[in-house]
Design a protein with these regions (language model features):
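A glycine-rich beta-to-alpha transition motif near the start of alpha/beta enzyme domains, typified by
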Residues: 1-123, 170-289
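Glycine-centered structural positions embedded in regular secondary structure
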Residues: 47, 131, 160-162, 282
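Flexible, glycine/proline-enriched loop segments at strand-loop-helix junctions
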Residues: 83, 131-133
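Short, solvent-exposed secondary-structure boundary/capping segments
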Residues: 124-131
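C-terminal domain-closing interface element
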Residues: 136, 142-146, 150-155, 163, ...
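Short, conserved active-site entrance elements at the starts or edges of catalytic domains
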Residues: 141-147, 192-197
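Internal active-site segments that recognize and position negatively charged phosphoryl groups
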Residues: 147-181
Length: 289
């Protein structure tokens, strides 16, 4: 693979390589994704996003969204695996579409494997309606508040709560005796029972009313500086533990890469707001030259 155009961007330092494919001819292989995402031998990123017309997507369920969204966010994790979507990535994707004139106006839809995502420009940058954040409130969770056990490397076993934001998450709130910065996330935390599709794991420290800090280990990537859907999952779980009502709809989520805002809407969806920055354009030659 030679002469591949790309754009590099990030949302709160969760970084991505965007690959435009306006004719739908280059379905990236796992090896190509891993090579592009490699921080030493490639461009470097937490994920790779192919920018392709929705009508040319391989998946019929995605193509069905073409009447409402012109562009499909074909998201891949850094290890080459296919993912449903990425919250921070949707903002970077939106910034790219607007810069290139592929979308116009302050509000439009993006097609993803997790369904349509509505984007609008706001003072912070971009706000994306990610749909419902579904807390797994099955019987065990209703009784104890938890339905998983999470063990970070070298740390104690901690209770966790599963949340679905179009992709899987397990949220852990830290006890006062454990500092967020002390966690070793250099290896994937052990989660039991382990979901068959894997899970992102968010560790949360409560800073105040409607204000949390978070670190995340993303499936297929490792620890990242930010995770948009993870911020939504963390806010949704903390809100559920608090008792969700009209007084705790807006949450500030501090991540190592910056700050995000999560708002739970009247429609029962979660809106994620934050910055998106495009930092470079180039041609990747796969080491040639």
């Amino acid at each position: 693979m030679h002469g591949l155009a790309f754009t590099k961007g990030h949302g709160t330092e969760n970084d991505f390589v965007l690959v435009p494919d306006p004719e739908g001819r280059h379905d990236l292989t796992p090896d190509e994704v891993r090579a592009l995402a490699d921080r030493r031998a490639g461009v470097g990123g937490d994920g790779v996003i192919r920018v392709v017309p929705t009508r040319l997507a391989d998946d019929p369920a995605v193509r069905a969204q073409s009447g409402q969204a012109a562009w499909f966010m074909d998201y891949r994790n850094a290890d080459g695996s296919v993912s449903e979507m990425c919250g921070n990535g949707t903002r970077v994707f939106a910034a790219y579409l607007l810069r290139e004139g592929l979308e116009r106006g302050g509000e439009f839809a993006i097609a993803t494997r997790a369904g349509l995502k509505q984007v609008r420009t706001v003072a912070q940058g971009y706000a994306v309606d990610l749909g419902a954040a579904r807390v797994d409130d099955s019987e065990g969770a209703r009784e104890t508040g938890f339905n998983a056990v999470v063990h970070a490397h070298g740390g104690p076993e901690l209770p966790g709560l599963r949340v679905d934001v179009g992709n899987p998450h397990t949220v852990v709130v830290l006890p006062p005796t454990l500092a967020l910065g002390d966690l070793d996330l250099s290896v994937a935390p052990h989660v039991a029972p382990h979901p068959s599709a894997g899970t992102n794991v968010e560790f949360v420290q409560i800073l105040g009313s409607g204000h949390i800090a978070m670190r995340v280990h993303e499936r297929g990537v490792g620890e990242t500086r930010s995770c948009g859907t993870g911020a939504v999952a963390a806010a949704a779980a903390t809100r559920w533990w608090d008792g969700a009502d009209d007084t705790n709809r807006e949450w500030t989520v501090d991540v190592p890469g910056g700050r995000l805002t999560v708002t739970f809407t009247d429609a029962g969806t979660a809106e994620l707001a934050g910055p998106a920055v495009l930092v470079a354009d180039g041609i990747w030659t796969d080491g040639a030259g």
